[in-house]
Amino acid sequence: MVLSAADKSNVQAAWGKVGGHAADYGAEALERMFLSFPTTKTYFPHFDLSHGSAQVKGHGAKVAAALTKAVGHLDDLPGALSELSDLHAHKLRVDPVNFKLLSHSLLVTLASHLPNDFTPAVHASLDKFLASVSTVLTSKYR
């Protein structure tokens, strides 16, 4: 999915407002995903998945760091996320549908924390961005 100039601007502006909360929002999105889609827990059998657990917070920080990197490389998502794509495809073998579920949970989390900034245009741009990230992360499954 190609991001337009307006999409890129919207994504950068929205992620800029996330600021220092990125790791917290990442953890919150994971918690939302685990609660809303319990089958996603199967990829984390060694995690304490309770609210506020250090492991969920740590993985949320990793998710946030990857998205921050992606926002900084909107013109080269495949290059920026190549190692992460390899990890999820070849080592972790995460079912690709889970990226869509996490993307949805991230959108809900961002909408709840940035209600005044989460316009329909920003929502659409973030959705396209997360779909693009998901496409890159699943590109090496073939």
UniProtKB/Swiss-Prot annotation:
UniProt-listed InterPro entries: Globin, Globin-like_sf, Globin/Proto, Hemoglobin_a-typ, Hemoglobin_oxygen_transport, Hemoglobin_pi
GO cellular component: blood microparticle; haptoglobin-hemoglobin complex; hemoglobin complex
Binding site for heme b: 88
Keyword ATP-binding: no
Coiled-coil stretches noted in the UniProt entry, renumbered to this chain: none
Binding site for O2: 59
GO biological process: hydrogen peroxide catabolic process
Keyword Membrane: no
Domain Globin span(s) in chain numbering: 2-142
Gene3D superfamilies attached to this UniProt entry: Globins
Molecular-function GO terms, alphabetical: haptoglobin binding; heme binding; iron ion binding; organic acid binding; oxygen binding; oxygen carrier activity; peroxidase activity
Disulfide partners: none
Family in the record: Belongs to the globin family.
Assembly and interaction partners: Heterotetramer of two alpha chains and two beta chains.
Designated name of the protein: Hemoglobin subunit alpha-1
Organism: Bubalus bubalis
